[in-house]
Curated annotation (Swiss-Prot):
NCBIfam families: rplD_bact (TIGR03953). GO terms for molecular function: rRNA binding; structural constituent of ribosome. It holds the Pfam family Ribosomal_L4. Belongs to the universal ribosomal protein uL4 family. This is Large ribosomal subunit protein uL4. Part of the 50S ribosomal subunit.
Length: 200
């Protein structure tokens, strides 16, 4: 199959990478796993066993008129432990390489079908200026965009850093969440070739 390149000849690409059927279930599973892997999982609370305080019975069982109590660290007391205390945990989910690659291919194919993938010969700017990048994006009628280059262009990265709906990645740094998060995905010809090799 062929992809149209802005201001250049069409680019022949693999049908298995850019012409794959949309697999919503697979994409959902991979995106959920990716988001789960980004969680810190460092939350921690103390149980009644871990809270500081004496284990002595505060007052005798009977005869005081007060409610019976055996421990000042009880969860129903102020400063007591937490009943079902949260503990640090690893939220990551296992995703096979084949599944991950399949999800990326499915997303790329859907971007092509929806005309959201814009292929350009090159995407460069002369200086790390946000103003210059904004002007270049206006020329291409782009606003909410992910820019993918073969290798990370420092000028481009620095210029895009202060723009709300613009992100710059190299071909190695693409992930399913960023691919579906933007309205358009601009990718250079060299990056397309690199992505094809990576997903082969």
């Amino acid at each position: 199959m062929e992809l149209q390149v802005v201001g250049a000849n069409a680019l022949t690409v693999s049908e298995t990478t850019f012409g794959r059927e949309f697999n919503e279930a697979l994409i959902h599973q991979v995106v959920v796993a990716y988001a789960a892997g980004a969680r810190q999982g460092s939350r921690a609370q103390k149980t009644r066993a871990e809270v500081s305080g004496s284990g002595k019975k505060p007052w005798r069982q009977k005869g005081t008129g007060r409610a019976r109590s055996g421990d000042i660290r009880s969860p129903i007391w102020r400063s007591g432990g937490v009943t079902f205390a949260a503990k640090p945990q690893d939220h990551s989910q296992k995703v096979n390489k084949k599944m991950y690659r399949g999800a990326i291919k499915s997303i790329l194919s859907e971007l092509v079908r929806q005309d959201r993938l814009v292929v350009v010969d090159k995407f460069e700017i002369d200086a790390p200026k946000t103003k210059v990048l904004v002007q270049k994006l206006k020329e291409l009628a782009l606003e909410d965009v992910l820019i993918i280059t073969a290798s990370l262009d420092e000028n481009l990265f620095l210029a895009a850093r202060n723009l709300y709906k613009v992100d710059v990645r190299d071909a190695q740094g693409i992930d399913p969440v960023s691919l579906i998060a933007f309205d358009k995905v601009v990718v250079t010809v060299d990056a397309v070739k690199q992505i094809e090799e990576m997903l082969a």
